[in-house]
Amino acid sequence: EMNFTRTMHGVMRNIAHFCSRSKSRVWGKDGWQKIVVCIVADGRKKVHPRVLDAFPAMGVYQAGIAKNSINGREVKAHVYEYTTQVSLDSDLKFKGAEKGIVPVQMIFCLKELNAKKLNSHRCIFQRFWSTLNPNVCILLDVGTRPGHDSLYHLWKAFDTDSNVGGACGEIKAMKGKGWMGLFNPLVAS
């Protein structure tokens, strides 16, 4: 759950950054209303139970409601939607408006079966994007912690040049406290 909360808290901090841009023609105080965070869990039995425990804390998911079948038909996925005003940081501490967290619109799709990453991407693009009709889509893997304004800079690349069809950000290794992570050869390289 630490990887999930690290990523989710970073996304929520980025949404707060969008809302802090008071002189922007696009963003500002209510900028959060233009952003929807979609999370896909690839397989109900595959997702770690402690990750699922983080969702009710944010109000997005209720355990025990999802059923494997309805009227004899297999269920493919369960979709939950909520506008949360609470974040869990990587230390599993609650953060809210007092720490600069703004409301975040969330869609959580819990797939019954693990069908791998490409199927999850297709699920997002086919099922949600046709309804949401976004101008920009940013994909993040669990464990990636975006910098406080990195999603804004990715969005800005699309906003300033309509010919941009894709963009990627820079990935930096988390070095840990006192750079202790550098003792790990994978981090150090």
Curated annotation (Swiss-Prot):
It catalyses: [(1->4)-N-acetyl-beta-D-glucosaminyl](n) + UDP-N-acetyl-alpha-D-glucosamine = [(1->4)-N-acetyl-beta-D-glucosaminyl](n+1) + UDP + H(+). GO terms for cellular component: cell septum; plasma membrane. InterPro entries: Chitin_synth, Chitin_synth_fun. It is found in: Cell membrane. Keywords: Cell membrane, Cell wall biogenesis/degradation, Glycosyltransferase, Membrane, Transferase, Transmembrane. It comes from the Eukaryota. It is a multi-pass membrane protein. One of its GO terms (molecular function) is chitin synthase activity. Pfam families: Chitin_synth_1. The keyword Transcription regulation does not apply. Its EC number is 2.4.1.16. GO terms for biological process: cell wall organization; chitin biosynthetic process. The keyword Cell cycle does not apply. Belongs to the chitin synthase family. Polymerizes chitin, a structural polymer of the cell wall and septum, by transferring the sugar moiety of UDP-GlcNAc to the non-reducing end of the growing chitin polymer. This is Chitin synthase 1. It comes from Tuber uncinatum (Burgundy truffle). The lineage of its organism: Eukaryota, Fungi, Dikarya, Ascomycota, Pezizomycotina. The gene is CHS1.
